[in-house]
Amino acid sequence: MIRIATLNDLTDILSIEKKVFKHPWSIEQLSWELNSQPVTENHVMIARGNMIGYLFSHVVDDDVQILNIAIDIPFQHIGYCEQLLSYFLDQFNADSSIHLEVRKSNFPAINLYLKFGVHETATRKGYYSDG
């Protein structure tokens, strides 16, 4: 099941964030995104009664910025991230402009995005502190 994320999901999201990312978002960043900002569209994925992943984005008209997507470690590499991304992208039409950043070394994410027809349009030098 996929549903809109709320501030009540903060603890579970933070737990996944800290396990999945080398440089996790802070509780303040996550809280700000979950506090019903007018441009945020955030989703969580639930399996067997537990949160297993989430996607954070900003949407302004047809301009979509995927900010953060994560699946808890025990549920990775079995299709959940693809399901979450597919669900999210299906909400937009062909005229929508979808943007995201990904580390050049994050091959699983890059391969996932390629499945959805995403292609590189630019490189932001120094965007990530570790390359």
Per-region residue spans from a language model:
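Structural preference for long, well-ordered alpha-helical segments within the folded cores
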Residues: 87, 111-115
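Conserved GNAT acetyl-CoA-binding A-motif
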Residues: 91-102
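Acetyl-CoA-dependent GNAT
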Residues: 4-78, 82-91
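Active-site-proximal loop/turn and secondary-structure-junction residues that shape catalytic pockets
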Residues: 70, 104-106
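Short glycine/proline-centered loop/turn elements that form peptide/ligand docking sites
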Residues: 81, 85, 106-109, 126-131
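Long, compositionally biased, intrinsically disordered segments
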Residues: 72, 95, 112-113
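Conserved catalytic-core motifs of GNAT/GCN5-like acyltransferases
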Residues: 99-101, 114, 119-131
